[in-house]
C-alpha cells in the first residue's frame, strides 16, 4: 500500500497554523560555538514561503547571516514542534511590507523602506510534531 505524502504547501500551512496558534515560538541560532535561543512571534506565508522578521541591528540577525541553520520550537500545551532549516534573507520591499502589514504593531520600530527591517524565509525545512501520547510525525517543505 502506498503511503500518502502531503504536498509541500499543505505541510508549510500546517506548520504556519501551529506557530500562529502558539503565538510565541523559540528560535535557536549559533554564535561561534554557543547556542542562542530567544522568543519570536512573527510568522507569515508570502509567495509560498514561510517567513519570519527581525532587525538587522540585532545579534540574531548577525547569527543567521553567519550560520543560516536554525531550529524553531513551539508548544501548544499538548504537542510540540521542532522546525529545522536554513534562513534566507529577502531584501525586497514587497516581502517586508507583507510582514509589517500582518503585524502593524511593529511599524513603530520597523518600516519596509528602512535599512534595519529584515525578513527571512526558511528552506530545506523539516518539521517534527511530537507529543507524549502519539508517535512523532515529520513533514518537509
Task: Give residue ranges: language-model regions.
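Charged, gly/pro-rich active-site loop segments
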Residues: 2-4, 82-141
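A short mixed-secondary-structure module that forms the rim of ligand-binding clefts
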Residues: 43-78
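A short, Trp-centered hydrophobic/proline-enriched beta-strand micro-motif
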Residues: 17-31, 70-72
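Short, Lys/Arg-enriched N-terminal segments with co-localized hydrophobic residues
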Residues: 1-11
Amino acid at each position: 500500500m502506498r503511503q500518502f505524502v502531503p504536498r509541500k504547501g499543505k505541510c508549510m500551512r500546517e506548520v504556519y497554523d501551529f506557530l500562529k496558534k502558539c503565538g510565541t515560538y523559540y528560535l535557536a541560532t549559533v554564535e561561534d560555538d554557543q547556542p542562542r535561543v530567544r522568543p519570536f512571534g512573527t510568522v507569515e506565508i508570502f509567495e509560498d514561503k514561510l517567513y519570519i522578521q527581525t532587525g538587522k541591528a540585532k545579534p540574531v540577525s548577525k547569527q543567521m547571516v553567519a550560520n543560516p541553520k536554525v531550529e524553531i520550537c513551539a508548544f501548544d500545551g499538548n504537542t510540540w514542534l521542532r522546525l529545522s532549516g536554513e534562513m534566507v534573507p529577502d531584501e525586497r520591499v514587497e516581502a517586508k511590507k507583507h510582514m509589517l502589514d500582518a503585524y502593524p504593531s511593529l511599524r513603530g520600530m520597523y518600516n519596509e523602506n528602512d535599512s534595519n527591517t529584515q525578513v527571512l524565509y526558511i528552506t530545506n525545512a523539516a518539521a517534527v510534531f511530537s507529543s507524549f501520547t502519539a508517535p512523532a510525525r515529520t513533514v518537509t517543505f
